[in-house]
Amino acid sequence: MKLSFTKMHGAGNDFVVLDGYSHTLPPLTDVQVRALADRHFGIGADQLLVVEKPTVDGADFKYRIFNCDGGEVEHCGNGARCFVKFVTDRGLTDKRSVRVQVMKGLITLTMQDNGEVVVDMGAPVFEPAQVPFDASGLDGRTDGNDTLWPLDVGGATRWVSTVSMGNPHAVQVVDDAEAYPVLAEGPLIERHARFPKRVNAGFMQIVSRHEVKLRVYERGAGETLACGTGACAAVAAGIRRGLLDTPVTVHTHGGTLTISWDGAHDERAALTMAGPATTVFEGEIELNV
């Protein structure tokens, strides 16, 4: 089976994008997704993005996301920016703002004149059961307007904020994000028994009230150069704890994102993310698995 694809990245978080809107794509198995995402024998990517026609009213497109392990996930902020650049560059829309159907609802994506994309990420969710996070039997610690939860991570206690941005996140504040053992602790948090759907593990260093450094060990993908929903979750947790003020510049290994959230005044407010989206190359691949 021969597939046409576009390789893109958002702040280094890289994607294989498939057009299932202009023509029908065959269903992809998890084995095929892993083959496409393989960096040695395939194209190589953190996630696979599929553009489809919407199945709900009020949406212009449908957006599906598959991690490099083959599993389908709810949301990807960096992918969303690449998504709107893809449909714009392909002439699939002439709108500056589009409404896109994702697993958890609808999101709004806006292409700016400077080439950056603003994503309306919706309101963060902190209720443990909705993340989902099993807080039963745990004594949480109040910090500002947030609750920190103790996790046993390799025999050490780590205090985390739990946040859903349509997908689950556990965020902890660290002194030095660069030196922190993310590759050792990330997998332990990702698969911690308290998170029934696994979790994205974020490690945030506060630089100032408007600036942070962030590393994220993503569920099903490992550490990536950037994670859009992870940046949103980290900033939301920081504002809720009284450590940050909007807007916040988030420095990742792959680039810089700007996150804005008026959560200090209204936690139901939508959070927005602005950042780059880049097309790397296009091609065809013979898929023989």
From Swiss-Prot:
Enzyme Commission code(s) on record: 5.1.1.7
Swiss-Prot/TrEMBL keywords: Amino-acid biosynthesis, Cytoplasm, Isomerase, Lysine biosynthesis
Pfam families per record: DAP_epimerase
Residue positions of the active site: 76 (proton donor), 227 (proton acceptor)
Molecular function per GO: diaminopimelate epimerase activity
Pathway(s) it belongs to: Amino-acid biosynthesis; L-lysine biosynthesis via DAP pathway; DL-2,6-diaminopimelate from LL-2,6-diaminopimelate: step 1/1
Transmembrane segments: none
GO biological process: lysine biosynthetic process via diaminopimelate
Site (Could be important to modulate the pK values of the two catalytic cysteine residues): 169, 218
Residue positions binding substrate: 13, 47, 67, 77-78, 167, 200, 218-219, 228-229
Cross-referenced InterPro entries: DAP_epimerase_AS, DAP_epimerase_DapF
Reactions catalysed according to its record: (2S,6S)-2,6-diaminopimelate = meso-2,6-diaminopimelate
Cellular localization per UniProt: Cytoplasm
Subunit structure of this chain's protein: Homodimer.
Family per similarity comment: Belongs to the diaminopimelate epimerase family.
Protein name: Diaminopimelate epimerase
Organism: Burkholderia vietnamiensis (strain G4 / LMG 22486) (Burkholderia cepacia (strain R1808))
Gene label: dapF
